[in-house]
Design a protein with these regions (language model features):
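Catalytic Tyr-X3-Lys loop
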Residues: 1-10, 25, 29, 46, ...
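Active-site helix of classical SDR
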Residues: 13, 49, 57
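Alpha-helical segment proximal to the catalytic Tyr-Lys
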Residues: 18, 62-66, 123
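Residue(s) in the substrate-gating loop at a strand-loop-helix junction
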Residues: 33
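Short, flexible catalytic-loop segment of classical short-chain dehydrogenase/reductase
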Residues: 37, 75-86
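Active-site loop immediately N-terminal to the catalytic Tyr-X3-Lys motif
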Residues: 38-44, 66-67, 102, 120
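Active-site loop-to-helix junction immediately N-terminal to the catalytic Tyr of the SDR YXXXK motif
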Residues: 39-47, 59, 87
Length: 138
């Protein structure tokens, strides 16, 4: 988990950064998780890896801010995916009871946040960790 989530983000970023710096423009959007923000029983490795991605994002944002490259991350909460739908109904209901909006997120909502950060509207946003979790973590 640590190698995929941390090394994967680092190695993918390395591939694109030089070109972004050459053109003095670029957008990096990493995916973290609400679990990286709040932790979760039995998921110490996953939580640590996602928190590491957030810290990497903020550090890289500081390094590249004056060079035309923004670096942000999106931290989805529980989202309607195969992983969440496979959770037993009783546990899913307990999760929903903790989410003020009383529903799971949709993949499209996460995607729209990524598009926003990459669009002109996101020009002045860097080093941000955008939480998309229905109010689960504020």
């Amino acid at each position: 988990v640590l190698a995929i989530n941390l090394d994967g983000v680092f190695n993918c970023t390395k591939v694109f950064i030089d070109q972004m710096l050459k053109q003095s423009f670029g957008r990096v959007v990493n995916i973290t998780s609400v679990i990286g923000q709040i932790g979760n029983f039995g998921q110490a490795n996953y939580a640590a890896s996602k928190a590491g991605v957030a810290a990497f994002t903020k550090s890289l944002a500081k390094e590249l801010a004056g060079k035309g490259v923004t670096v942000n991350c999106v931290a989805p909460g529980f989202t309607e995916t195969d992983m969440v739908t496979s959770i037993p109904e009783k546990v899913r209901q307990k999760l929903l009871d903790q989410i003020p909006m009383r529903r799971f997120g949709k993949a499209e909502e996460v995607a729209r946040a990524c598009v926003y950060l990459c669009a002109k509207d996101g020009d002045y946003i860097t080093g941000a960790e955008l939480s998309i979790n229905g109010g689960l973590f504020m």
